[in-house]
Amino acid sequence: MSVIKMTDLDLAGKRVLIRADLNVPVKDGKVTSDARIRASLPTIEAALKQGAKVMITSHLGRPIEGEYNEEFSLKPVVDYLKEKLSSSVRLEKEYLEGVEVSEGELVVLENVRFNKGEKKDDESLAKKYASLCDIYVMDAFGTAHRAQASTHGVAKFAPVACAGPLLFGELEALGKALDNPARPMVAIVGGSKVSTKLTVLDTLSKIADQLIVGGGIANTFVAAEGHNVGRSLYEDDLIPEAKKLLISCDIPVPTDVRVATEFSETAEATLKSSSDIKDDEQILDLGDESAQRLADILKNAKTILWNGPVGVFEFPNFRQGTEIVARAIADSDAFSIAGGGDTLAAIDLFGIADKISYISTGGGAFLEFVEGKKLPAVVMLEERAKQ
């Protein structure tokens, strides 16, 4: 990957526009989960320390494009940044015709989705973004798979376009896990549907020494082995695909599971063999034997890629499987990389963030990179590096 890195540039006195991923949950005007902002702080601080005139922007939520809506304003992010940074921080609502920024000051440019043409990568909008800066820094891995005006078009027209430390770090960590992994490599793919992760499963089946499936995805594999899965979430039409994967690679299908007769937080868990599931039952977690089997596999891994929980961990009675897997990853000496919203929520719940080698901030971008797809924002940075 050949891109210009922000860390290699002299930013002093330059107008620097950072496209970050500050798309955080907000409730009653307050940020409720600051993980993405925290991940962006080192980039912001590095630019300010160099004496740059720093502007930062992001999308937040899904407002109607081209219309201002206070509900989706970046103001709560600005309030958070004011608490964390010693520099002056202000929010700029109207900025497309130009904005004044002083050295060592941080100006947050309001939600890019308030600008008409953002999502369609409108060229005239991209040029307006580009005219604001001397150096454009793409640091939002979470949106690198989208070709939009603030992630892609602007990089085409800015005087200099580079990768921020967070984006570069994400790409480097994923490259380490996928391009030439230390072996054995174990990949865990959980979540609800095979259909949304079929390409990922197929790609990883060719890279990983061991593929682990969990959640609703594992239910489809249980069904593929001929077992009744009752009212479990599974995809009948994808059983042939699951059978193909079972032939082509080693996938440990759950032999025991926790089931319930209702999908609720208070549902009672019953531990039973995968071959004994009744018509009115649904699988909501792995059984002890199956979870321990996965923990034993992870113990010997040298590289672990984790995307998705292995059960309905949000319900206390059905989080044991995900917790056993999570703690096995945390205790492993392997290089581990985790990504996806539910995965990050599980990491937070079990308090193991400091024991995962790399936590990716991207959901869709993480999966598309794993699938082997080119990320438009990264392709543009590579093109600019050649000029």
From Swiss-Prot:
Disulfide bonds: none annotated. Keywords: ATP-binding, Cytoplasm, Glycolysis, Kinase, Nucleotide-binding, Transferase. Gene3D superfamilies: Phosphoglycerate kinase, N-terminal domain. One of its GO terms (molecular function) is ATP binding. GO terms for biological process: gluconeogenesis; glycolytic process. SUPFAM superfamilies: Phosphoglycerate kinase (SSF53748). Substrate binds at D21, L22, N23, R36, H59, L60, G61, R62, R113, R146. Pfam families: PGK. GO terms for cellular component: cytosol. Its EC number is 2.7.2.3. ATP binds at K197, E314, G340, G341, D342, T343. It is found in: Cytoplasm. It catalyses: (2R)-3-phosphoglycerate + ATP = (2R)-3-phospho-glyceroyl phosphate + ADP. Belongs to the phosphoglycerate kinase family. PANTHER family: PHOSPHOGLYCERATE KINASE, PHOSPHOGLYCERATE KINASE 1, CHLOROPLASTIC-RELATED. Monomer. This is Phosphoglycerate kinase. The gene is pgk.
